[in-house]
């Protein structure tokens, strides 16, 4: 056990699976003696040195193969004296290289061969590491059928992995011919990559006692739902039912609720507050605008006996002094909640809205502040960014996840992909909509001019709109007063010029047109969020994707689809999966081998095997 730990430490990894994924060979060097003298083959030859000649920048060593009795030339370009002195006339050496034939004189040649002191083995070639030999030794000490089985790898997959890390000459030849691993070996790497992912999820899953087990509150919930001026969708009702079960449990729940744009998750949030009553609920939103929206929705729809308070950064001291008195049932705020020193002991439920906008540490800090003596509050995390079905499949054994797919009323949004020469269509529609007292957002790809991007920036484009329309507002992520600008625009503006900061959650009831410049630079999930700003209250909506590209299949497919979950699947096909394990990056690929768009069968197989071998219960997430 100690030897294994020492080897893992030397490799700078924490588990055998991680070692296999970090140090998967990117190629092989077969140091076996060549079986035949044939151009195109790489391997080891024993050669006798006949003579050496220096031609300006080229050193030629004339030699012969002792096994095959063939003459050949060893060629070094831009050589140093070191190479010249390595080869002594009359001596024999073992060299490694690729046998080729000169197009000039048909002589057999090896360019820049390597002199060997030992041979007969197959060396693994790793990416971006220095001591290949030592890494190979340590890996091969760790690797065995027994150790792989201990990690939960089934035997047929384990044997394929052993072939990758203990390769035969035949395996190396196949690898070099195909420039990759055979398909069954690639599937073995996919298997352990998903197994490693699931083990990481399982490691985070910890159970804690709930600080407060809430009452059933069925009658109170029924009265709340009956008071609403609209009917809840089936998905909303199912989500509320799952949350009700969570909140009455003595185990602190942590549930992720994922809803499409406009699915009505605010009503699920308010129903959760009703279910927690008379205990207190704390809700954290990423911006003041969203916090205020939720506050006003709570005042509008929660029963009259609820006392709801709002805490924002810079709130007046006198007003915030009574926020946490016993009479308050719901506190809604921004990250200002994290810096408030009051006792949160009476809060049974902590809700994070647009949870992907917060870092793990921020979410954990809020939960920790509301914990008491090792007992935790119930925690609900809401997100309006649908995830692919395959990722949901992988997560579902470890994270309590609820999907809200149904939309209370179908949105009527027309999406058009337009070239800049067709911008007249956009201008005509903007004029029409402003005449109806509707609003428009124009999204620019960047704030200031850039030589690298062939589009106008926000600062360059502002004058174009200001000359043609009234009531123009401009803001960006760099604007310290952006929330005030957006709030004023909501009441008084016609056109808002902005960057993608308006992507999530902002409610603009009169907004009917969004114009997105350089849409090819954005992921489909971001485009879907931006488009989701229009048609919030039943207005006919228009989304114009204005590009300089003549054709873009990805944008055309997006234009034909309004379902956020289907767009999440589509997004996988056109971009790498993103850092889905950590929840941070939005591009790049956290999975090197698994393709979330195509490998559902492997994911299902790993999940089935893992649950069979591990004691996995529906617990909660630490982070």
UniProtKB/Swiss-Prot annotation:
It comes from Helicobacter pylori (strain J99 / ATCC 700824). The lineage of its organism: Bacteria, Pseudomonadati, Campylobacterota, Epsilonproteobacteria, Campylobacterales. Keywords: ATP-binding, DNA damage, DNA recombination, DNA repair, DNA-binding, Helicase, Hydrolase, Isomerase, Nucleotide-binding. This is ATP-dependent DNA helicase RecG. It catalyses: Couples ATP hydrolysis with the unwinding of duplex DNA by translocating in the 3'-5' direction; ATP + H2O = ADP + phosphate + H(+). The wedge domain within the N-terminus inserts into the replication fork junction, where the lagging and leading strand split. GO terms for molecular function: ATP binding; ATP hydrolysis activity; DNA binding; DNA helicase activity. The keyword Transferase does not apply. Its EC number is 5.6.2.4. Monomer. Residues 422-578 form the Helicase C-terminal domain. It is an enzyme of class 5 (isomerase). A motif (DEAH box) lies at residues 353-356. PANTHER family: ATP-DEPENDENT DNA HELICASE HOMOLOG RECG, CHLOROPLASTIC. Residues 32-120 are annotated as: Wedge domain. Residues 246-404 form the Helicase ATP-binding domain. GO terms for biological process: DNA recombination; DNA repair. Belongs to the helicase family. RecG subfamily. ATP binds at residues 259-266. Plays a critical role in recombination and DNA repair. Helps process Holliday junction intermediates to mature products by catalyzing branch migration. Has replication fork regression activity, unwinds stalled or blocked replication forks to make a HJ that can be resolved. Has a DNA unwinding activity characteristic of a DNA helicase with 3'-5' polarity.
């Amino acid at each position: 056990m100690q030897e294994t730990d020492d080897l893992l430490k030397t490799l700078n990894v924490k588990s055998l699976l991680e070692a296999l994924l970090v140090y998967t060979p990117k190629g092989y060097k077969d140091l076996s003696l060549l079986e035949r003298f044939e151009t195109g083959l790489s391997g080891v030859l024993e050669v006798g040195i006949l003579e050496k000649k220096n031609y300006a920048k080229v050193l030629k060593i004339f030699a012969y193969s002792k096994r095959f009795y063939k003459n050949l030339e060893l060629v070094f370009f831009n050589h140093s004296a070191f190479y010249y002195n390595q080869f002594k006339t009359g001596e024999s050496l073992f060299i490694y290289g690729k046998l080729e034939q000169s197009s000039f004189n048909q002589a057999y040649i090896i360019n820049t061969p390597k002199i060997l002191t030992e041979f007969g083995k197959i060396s693994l070639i790793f990416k971006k590491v220095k001591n290949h030999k030592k890494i190979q030794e340590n890996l091969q000490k760790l690797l065995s059928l027994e150790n792989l089985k201990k990690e939960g790898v089934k035997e047929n997959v384990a044997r394929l992995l052993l072939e990758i890390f203990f390769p035969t000459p035949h395996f190396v030849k196949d690898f070099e011919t195909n420039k990759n691993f055979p398909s069954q070996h690639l599937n073995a790497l996919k298997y352990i990559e998903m197994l490693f992912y699931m083990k990481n999820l399982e490691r985070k899953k910890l159970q804690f006692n709930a600080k407060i087990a809430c009452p059933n509150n069925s009658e109170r919930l029924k009265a709340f739902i009956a008071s609403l001026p609209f009917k809840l969708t089936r998905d909303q009702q199912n989500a509320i039912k799952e949350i009700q079960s969570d909140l009455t449990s003595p185990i602190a729940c942590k549930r992720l609720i994922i809803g499409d744009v406009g699915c009505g998750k605010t009503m699920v949030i308010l129903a959760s507050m009703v279910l927690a009553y008379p205990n207190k609920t704390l809700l954290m939103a990423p911006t003041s605008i969203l916090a205020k929206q939720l506050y006003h929705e709570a005042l509008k729809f929660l029963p009259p006996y609820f006392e709801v308070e709002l805490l924002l950064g810079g709130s007046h001291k006198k007003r915030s002094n009574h926020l946490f008195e016993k009479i308050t049932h719901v506190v809604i705020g921004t990250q200002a909640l994290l810096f408030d020193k009051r006792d949160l002991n009476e809060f049974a439920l902590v809700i994070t809205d647009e949870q992907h906008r917060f870092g793990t540490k921020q979410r954990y800090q809020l939960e920790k502040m509301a914990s008491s003596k090792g007992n935790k509050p119930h925690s609900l995390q809401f997100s309006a960014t649908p995830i692919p079905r395959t990722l949901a499949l992988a997560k579902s054994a470890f994270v309590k996840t609820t999907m809200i797919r149904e939309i209370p009323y179908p949105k009527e949004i027309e999406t058009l992909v337009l070239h800049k020469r067709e911008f007249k269509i956009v201008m005509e529609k903007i004029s029409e909509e402003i005449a109806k007292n509707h609003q428009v957002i124009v999204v620019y790809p960047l704030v200031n001019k850039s030589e690298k991007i062939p589009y106008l920036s926000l600062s360059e484009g502002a004058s174009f709109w200001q000359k043609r329309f009234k009531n123009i507002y401009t803001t960006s992520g760099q604007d310290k007063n952006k929330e005030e600008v957006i709030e004023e625009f909501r009441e008084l503006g016609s056109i808002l010029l902005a960057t993608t900061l308006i992507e999530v959650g902002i409610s603009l009831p009169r907004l009917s047109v969004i114009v997105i410049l350089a849409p090819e630079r954005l992921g489909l999930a971001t485009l879907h969020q931006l488009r989701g700003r229009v048609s919030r209250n039943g207005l006919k909506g228009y989304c114009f994707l204005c590009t300089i590209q003549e054709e873009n299949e990805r944008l055309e497919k997006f234009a034909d689809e309004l379902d956020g979950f289907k767009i999440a699947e589509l997004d996988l096909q056109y971009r790498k999966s993103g850092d889905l394990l950590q929840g941070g990056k939005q591009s790049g690929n956290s999975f090197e081998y698994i393709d979330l768009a195509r490998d559902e069968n492997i994911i299902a197989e790993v999940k089935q095997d893992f649950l069979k071998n591990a004691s996995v219960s529906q617990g909660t997430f630490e982070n």
